[in-house]
Curated annotation (Swiss-Prot):
Taxonomy of the source species: Eukaryota, Fungi, Dikarya, Ascomycota, Saccharomycotina
Sequence similarity: Belongs to the SNAP-25 family.
Function: Required to maintain the prospore membrane to the nucleus during sporulation in order to capture the daughter nuclei and form the spores. Mediates the fusion of exocytic vesicles with the plasma membrane during sporulation through its interactions with the t-SNARE SSO1 and v-SNARE SNC2.
Keywords carried by this UniProt record: Cell membrane, Coiled coil, Membrane, Sporulation
GO BP terms, alphabetized: ascospore-type prospore assembly; exocytosis; Golgi vesicle fusion to target membrane; intracellular protein transport; sporulation; vesicle fusion
Subunit structure: Interacts with the t-SNARE SSO1 and the v-SNARE SNC2.
Protein name per Swiss-Prot or TrEMBL: Sporulation-specific protein 20
UniProt subcellular location: Cell membrane; Prospore membrane
Example of a GO cellular component annotation carried by this entry: plasma membrane
Gene that produces this protein: SPO20
Composition bias, Basic residues: 10-26
Amino acid sequence: MGFRKILASKSHHSRHHNQHHKNLKLQNHRYVLISNITGSHETKYLSPFRMDNCSGSRRRDRLHVKLKSLRNKIHKQLHPNCRFDDATKTSDDKCVSYEVPERDGLATISLEEVFPKSNRCQIPEENLGETDSVIHRDLGNFANENDYPQWRKVESQYNLENVQPEEDEIVDRLRSEIRSTKLKSVKTTSRTLEKAIEARCTGKRVLQQLSCQSNQLTKIESNCDMLKIQSNVADRKIDELAHENRSLLALKSPNPFRKKREREKRDQIYNLKLKHRHLQQETMKRAQDSDKNLAINLSSEYGRYGQGVERQRILRDAQKYQFEADEEDNQMEIDLYGNLEQIKAVSGDLKIMAHAFGREFEAQNTRMFDIENNVQQADNALQAKRYRLEKVIGKRW
């Protein structure tokens, strides 16, 4: 049987009012008694929560704390299937527990093993009447050390001397936690490295697609340049056709004053060739710039770490993160360092590719805008030449 907090007042201090104790409210009473029922009568011990500074109260408080620690040791360490009986019982009269349901399969540890009858401190008979008005404040002094509760017998019976966790257990637990944390870190960095390498491969594919797209734009620009040149040639051919299609009555003798006009025509043809060459150079320059944007320096291979001098340096730097390091722990540190270094290298490659993407996107957007303008101008010129050619062919004399 165990200690039980019972409210004490002028009319409620006896063990014969258990049912009425259930209905009392704790917040309406200031003083609390902890009761233990002996063989023939009730023995009361003051609660450690009382507002008293006497030496007897402090001694009882220490006993209460030590007893509570002993109960927890028995319950948690050695007897997980045992519990203290919260009922207030005597050898003459058996009382039910205070709203504590019985649990099957659990043994009950009696506090008689801790407090034998011969060592229980009883309330002096001359002070029994004080409990009718106030809480009894002094339950007598212990005569000697043998009057203290005999929990030494219980410690020896339940072997509680060495229930504290051993230093080796603490070390093993710390080593296990460190090892599990490092394993998680290695796995996490490995997964991160895999995702980074996948992103790097995707970036390479995008670079290849941009390179193919740049080649297509180069071909389109070359065709636009040829369209401009052929448009100028068409103008010259239409002029010749108009000259040959002149009236029959027109003079056909050579004009000695046309040398200047012929010279201008030759200059026009020469300028047309220069323009063609200039357009081709611009097209090639754009293609080269595109290739230069896409020709980035990436880390083709990532070295293996943990060999020779590099291994010693890694292990020397990792000593502050290790606890009783062994070969497995050293290997985890090397793997972790290698994963982080590779992630760093791949991240640098991704950054370089991102900048290359930005430059190439801007360049290709500019090229496509120029292609659109050139095609629009060539279409307008083609419509004008068609109208002029129809006018020359349909001319009547």
